[in-house]
Swiss-Prot record:
Methyltransferase involved in ribosomal biogenesis. Specifically catalyzes the N1-methylation of the pseudouridine corresponding to position 914 in M.jannaschii 16S rRNA. GO terms for molecular function: rRNA (pseudouridine) methyltransferase activity; rRNA binding. It catalyses: a pseudouridine in rRNA + S-adenosyl-L-methionine = an N(1)-methylpseudouridine in rRNA + S-adenosyl-L-homocysteine + H(+). GO terms for biological process: rRNA base methylation. This is Ribosomal RNA small subunit methyltransferase Nep1. It comes from Thermoplasma volcanium (strain ATCC 51530 / DSM 4299 / JCM 9571 / NBRC 15438 / GSS1). Belongs to the class IV-like SAM-binding methyltransferase superfamily. RNA methyltransferase NEP1 family. Homodimer. Keywords: Methyltransferase, Ribosome biogenesis, RNA-binding, rRNA processing, rRNA-binding, S-adenosyl-L-methionine, Transferase. The gene is nep1. Its EC number is 2.1.1.-. S-adenosyl-L-methionine binds at G177, G182, I197, F198, R199, D200, E201, L202.
Amino acid sequence: MLHLIVADSELETIPEEMLDDPGVRRFAKKRNKRVDRMILDSNYMHAFIDKYYPGESKRRGRPDIIYILLEMAQESILNRKNLLRTYIHTRNDFVIKISPITRMPKSYNRFIGLFEDLFEKEIITNNGKTLLSLERMKLDELLESLKKDRTILLHPKGEFKKPSEFISTEDIAAIIGGFSEGDFRSDVSNIPEKYSIFRDELTIWSVGLEIVASYERAIGLL
């Protein structure tokens, strides 16, 4: 089993400091949404993020990168064989558990709407089956709850190795960062296995794809 953990993901609802901003409220009215139930999205709110959090507008409000990664993970052979579990840990210490049967909407706007519903209801079901669930949980608490043989961290400053050199058939928890720049907010210093798989910067979905595909090869699916 591969547990793919996207840690410190920049996925959040509108922060309290921004709730009364006239521009944000106009955007909410345009979407016919309550301001406090909207997901922060820098694609539309870049200027507002920069206004309230100077220097963070390239990092915060990035549900788009989570969407791309989940499209890859949920459609993978590994997931279709029920050997992948995907978790989104957010900057505010929520954990979203993605059921293997869940398929992401093909439309990005529908994805945003789905996750806005999740933040409001804390669970999304279909025909009695849980597709998505959300709960308060820190990264170390999530790791503690998983049955695994090893925990690995993908990090630009980790030991440079090909995935085939450290991915095995064991049950592995693989942590990748859910942000486009900067470093982990959570304390990951106690994770002994830290690896870098490429000399240059990669997108989080590229890293996720390499890890998933390498695990598929290791267990003989490819």
